[in-house]
């Protein structure tokens, strides 16, 4: 069976949805028709009663014949009306029943002429006229609220339609990405089978690079499609979750409307009608009861009918008469797209944190709303009781008018002094209408609040059920998660960026032109962070954040860092929102130029917001394209944020209040108080109608805001951003030609990617260019030549052709005399079994507090915290999948982190070379004295190299030395305390081996090379080739595996290397670089590379 017959098409799903919406719309229209018909029926009834009593008052002067005719006249009229049919169908309403009994009793009336005429004319008819006015007024107010309810229902259904289409779109993209991934896997398998059939002996030596290239291309394509599939799958999951949540909210809102709101709406239409009508009839009964005893039997029947005037019974009767109109419709069902089997909210790991945070926010919001709504309900009940007291005043007794001792004049005076006097009428009517107005205001507030609680409660219950199942599933008590885990995307750190133009308080256009970022990093990162963790945050952009944290985030952005890449557990949402507002508020040129202020304000003259779209669009078209792109991105985000106003309480108007003064500055000479309201209205209009105002991506290229964003773990490099920069350590000309080409052996390399140098010392080259390498300057840089110019070449952008592990061999030879070697690992086995295990933290042993400020690498250098799961080093040739995008030259530093350990991690050959390199250059201080001597040596060296910088360098070194000594003493104390607490003999600890005094101290520090620049000189390539087969499988390290007794199988992971700019070194000094007087990196620089001597290095 084909996929067309299995799954519904998008058009069919949309057609079914539109049909269901059309049916609901029809029901809503019919409801108002029914209520309007009921109101007209009541008005007709009241008009008939007024006419009846008016005629009866006139006819009371006549005799019983006229009264009999009157009764017969209305009886015949009723027999031909619809109410007569209702009576047959047992749908007789209580007011109609009273009317029937009155007519029946009228036939017995033949007496009481003048008194009854006075009472009917001055009392009963006036009451009926007031009731008619009340019916019309109450129906109009109820209709307004009903229309608002209908609009809310249609708005909810429209939102459900939008979310459903978004879900369909992302799911289609996920299916497409999955098919492409399968196609890539088939190509890889086909290529693998094809290469296996050929004999290695029959292939020529020059054909092998071509096969490797084809394999790498296929692997690149597979990895790229794998990443695309993972990203689309995550977006699809988020879109489906939103769809299901909106689906639950929509069904809950519709169900509440049909079950509760319609009933309450009918109650509003009936408010006071039955009570007022009862008073009128009781007035009539009071007059009639004083008539002759012969009428008592018939009047008792009427009294019983009046006592049975019941608004609830009539309401149920009306709803039973029109059961098809008032019955709730069918619930909206989840419409799976293209066979999607997941029909519930997914709480897997990529979205579990977000859902949990959203659940707690909903819980807090619901608690507040329920308290507020309960208070409103109490006020509503009290107001209703007051209204009932007003409407049930017992002022219908007119027995005094029938006293035989009184004259006609006394009867008139008594009537004038009673309730129906004009003064009392005006006073009572004013009080009643004022109370009614307050009641309707509170009723509207209560209905809106209860609707909001119903929707949020539905989401809350669904999230509670989902998260509860997820927790139980993790404990192994219920079924596994709905979706199988998909391959995760390799995380890549956001690069560091430093530009010549200011980010804050500068020109945004100049910054965008300089950086190449279509959206400034601070805006893009803050919006992404709020999208992931703050859409449900109450009062976002209105509640201020911590000023200290705002300044910290701002300073990080100004340094070119992105502090929000992986800090969702540390950053406050309100502080991030404050940074976003701070950035736009401090721009040198506001987002909306002051020159167009009057033009924008003039659009407010159009009362309809939809009519303002075209004038605003024509004004914004005149702005620069880069500004329009930023505006489009920002206002799309604000519109998305306003869609969660039920939870975050930030509708478009509230957002406009927050962003109006930020985005549109009021020019000098204008009254800020009077203009601010107009500014807010302009911003509100743009937020609501941003799609119609700003050009589409086809009309204007640039990044577009996406509602479903990936988290920090999946954060990829933006296609609109530029690679980060590395500041120079030495600002001298770094491209000085080498004095001799024969001092070192030249190594040939091929460029894997295009690279543009960001300083005079860095070389620029194209992909496939041939490069000459002199020696390895650091982990990430080579000294080399291209097109006759010497300079630095990034290691991650090249493939070394004829160096096969020579760099690792030279370091291994140097390390043999200094450190004990690690276990020998087979190269092939390590390449096959290079598996990533979950990262652990040593928080149980107190390392979080000891190493909270400084993380020590195996070579003794302090390294910043990095996100786990990614590696900044390129894999060795022929091993592992290659990366499809150029690696960044600089990594983004962040706050210190605990030391991670990997269980069962088998390191790749390239990482073993990095570990060997780190251990070769390490320096162990035997005691604090040696540490102080090293610091003083560094201070002396720094003063000789940078004597022109002044005395502040020595003060900085002293402060740094004091800080280092304090940190080391604290670390030693806590680690020794841990050692004393452990009863089992522990294996040597990495940190203890680094910090504790050694029994056999090494030779003088000056005898060891302090920098890799002194050892990376390949003089005998043949010898390196001879040793490559054996030394490539070795992993040289200064320390033994840490915590081997505590964590079985735990092995140190090589720390991620950050590209540190090597110092300037000419080739003429390479042969003597291992001497004491060489300008190498001092021990303190290796421990803390971010000190004063490295301030101009990588940020």
Curated annotation (Swiss-Prot):
Domain F-BAR, residue spans: 19-314
Keyword field contains Protein biosynthesis: no
A single GO cellular-component term on record: glutamatergic synapse
Coiled coil location: 352-392, 952-987
Location of the region described as Disordered in the Swiss-Prot/TrEMBL record: 470-493, 809-846, 861-911, 994-1014, 1045-1099
Extent of Polar residues compositional bias: 809-820, 1089-1099
Keyword vocabulary terms for this entry: Coiled coil, GTPase activation, Phosphoprotein, SH3 domain
SH3 domain location: 744-803
Positions carrying Phosphoserine: 817, 820-821, 837, 858, 954
Annotated GO MF terms: GTPase activator activity
Pfam families per record: FCH, RhoGAP, SH3_1
Organism domain of life: Eukaryota
Domain Rho-GAP: 506-694
Compositional bias per record (Low complexity), positions renumbered to this chain: 1060-1074
Site, Arginine finger: residue positions: 542
GO biological process: regulation of postsynapse assembly; signal transduction
Record-annotated membrane-spanning stretches: none
Function: GTPase-activating protein for RAC1 and perhaps CDC42, but not for RhoA small GTPase. May attenuate RAC1 signaling in neurons.
Subunit-level organization: Homodimer. Forms a heterooligomer with SRGAP1 and SRGAP2 through its F-BAR domain. Interacts with WASF1. Probably interacts with ROBO1. Interacts with FASLG.
Domain notes: The F-BAR domain mediates oligomerization, binds membranes, and induces plasma membrane protrusions.
Name the UniProt record assigns to this protein: SLIT-ROBO Rho GTPase-activating protein 3
